[in-house]
């Protein structure tokens, strides 16, 4: 197999000489969840005042809609701290929700009409109004239902000691180039092998029929009352039905280097869309979208993984990358895990540690658009029918195929080696245990999250009943939780500080909204 590497063992040996490397990974989690009411319907209330400003609270914000909460952990180097902080955020949030609960799945609860989905509001400042207008554009382009599918994003970075082990001493410019090159190698391998993530952790094999709202689909759904499902699906969220973007299929953004990526991204932001132009940009004094290009802003680019750098104030994501190179990567392919109150488990985090480290240490040849399309087709197969035993996946574009099971076992042969090294560094066997558990799932699709969830839905009679049962139990667990890493005082201080920050931003505005937008998009001219 050309794609499963030649140099992995040699690189692993280099890194393993400093066991501290494996204790210093940087991790952060962003978890989305819909607020819902007693009857299992989407909440139509505004963002709770007790959570502060969604615009400036660093831990608790909103995504597309007022009802779509997003929790953001600080960067942590310890898995227990990471998940403990996420627990604490859930606890505090639930204390501010009254009778409302947090929906425990990726696919939304019952939504009668799109009119029930209120766009997220962030205040009266120009930057806040721009965030809401961007969402107005998404609503008009793709519909609101697509935007309230929830996910979990996993942010990950290697410590400086990792790069020291592989490359020795370097100048600042050399190190920046080394990191970017390696992270893009990781990204290419993620496209090649990352279908393992929806296979194991996809948890959206079914949806409420209200989600379609009369739209046609070519997927051969089966019905269980008002629940639609695909018997072998893993992640409808990652399918064409979910949050992907067919309008972006014309884009050719490459991942062979940071320069190639930024060039493709810049072109996408400047490419006009005849389809989106029909929507209008400003009609009768009211904005309908930020602009009529294929992407309004960079965030609109759909991707299962993104190269990232923390931006300075006023800096666009691409400008941050151009300035300092890749700092970390954001994994965006995780469905909400419905079997835990916080949407992600320790086993998942350990697998991601292993998989992302393996992807970075493995050989990663350049990838043209043809090869990228072939790998994307593998992803499409896995999300729609990944639990079909013996499903054949393509190996690149040369016609060779291999079963999902055979390919996964080849990857795990190297993941096991890595797990042993990482366990040795930590003085336990937790990575090996996670590896062993998931390797059993390869030959037993019924153990995957999507299979477990579909079984539960069939037992309960519907997705709605299952979501309400789990969500009700998690509400009680969240309320009973005791702070482990944050404190009530810290959470309340952040709420108060967020309100002050929002007010300061609003008072600092010096131009009207039209001028603000013109200045923001001046770089497109």
Curated annotation (Swiss-Prot):
E.C. designation(s): 6.3.2.2
Statement: the UniProt record of this protein carries the keyword Transmembrane helix: no
GO molecular function: ATP binding; glutamate-cysteine ligase activity; metal ion binding
Pathway(s) of this molecule: Sulfur metabolism; glutathione biosynthesis; glutathione from L-cysteine and L-glutamate: step 1/2
Domain of life the protein comes from: Bacteria
Gene3D superfamilies: 3.30.590.20
Enzyme class: ligase
GO-annotated biological processes: glutathione biosynthetic process
Reactions listed under catalytic activity: L-cysteine + L-glutamate + ATP = gamma-L-glutamyl-L-cysteine + ADP + phosphate + H(+)
The keyword Nucleotide-binding appears for this protein: yes
GO annotations of cellular component type: cytosol
Keywords: ATP-binding, Glutathione biosynthesis, Ligase, Nucleotide-binding
Short name of any one Pfam family annotated for the protein: Glu_cys_ligase
Family stated for the protein in its record: Belongs to the glutamate--cysteine ligase type 1 family. Type 1 subfamily.
Designated name of the protein: Glutamate--cysteine ligase
Organism: Vibrio vulnificus (strain CMCP6)
GN (gene name): gshA
